Amino acid sequence: MCIRDSKKVAGNEFERKNGAYTLHLLAPAKVGLPYGTVPRLLLAWLTTEAVRTQNRELFLGDSLSHFMHELDMVPTGGRWGSITRLKDQTARLFASTVSATYADKRSHTEAGFRLADRSTLWWDAKAPEQAGLWESSVKLSETFFNEVIAHPIPVDMRAIRSLKKSPLALDIYAWMTYRASYATKPSEIPWQALAMQFGSDYAQVRDFKAAFLDALKKVLIVYPEARVSHGDFGLTLAPSRPHVRKPTKALPGPG
């Protein structure tokens, strides 16, 4: 989640670099790129469900209201309401194509994939409580599903819901609990590197640092087990207990 921009991006391409790693997100011009908290909530739910069910085919419930409840969103109508935002960001996310490149002096590796092969949404915005004739569903792409199963991010959806008003806090939480799941010794990450990794739009690193530390306070309320400290140079993460234990067995399901 920490690689999604928290603000609307002009155009239909988004690129972010972090050292030798480059992420490129492409969306159809008429659909646009996903942004804000809603795609983060969707990604957290999708990856959690994929690991829980071990299946590429995920069912979103028989009504719009039911699924919004899963994301801790209250259905509201109108042009700027939550229903409009959810439908818009869902379309943007499922239509996007991701490519990741790692290139240094010795190697060049590239991988690309869609998040979803198919999505079918039987949602009536005028009657969010009403069940559709069929249950809404999404079929994750095989590449994305396999990546999720092989490298699950151990997030607690209750924490995700409580942080939903802050895109940066959501990104920090997912990043910290993922790092905690494999860290074996303390590591210090420079503020400059963090600003690049989290897609900062701040003009100065010190401004990003202030925003990051403010969001970190919110994260530590829901994830107090995280062992983290900060100084002038950067942020230090020590091995911590993941917020959610990773599954002991992760085998792809049918489909």
Show the residue positions of the predicted features.
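Charged, alpha-helix-forming regions
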Residues: R4-G255
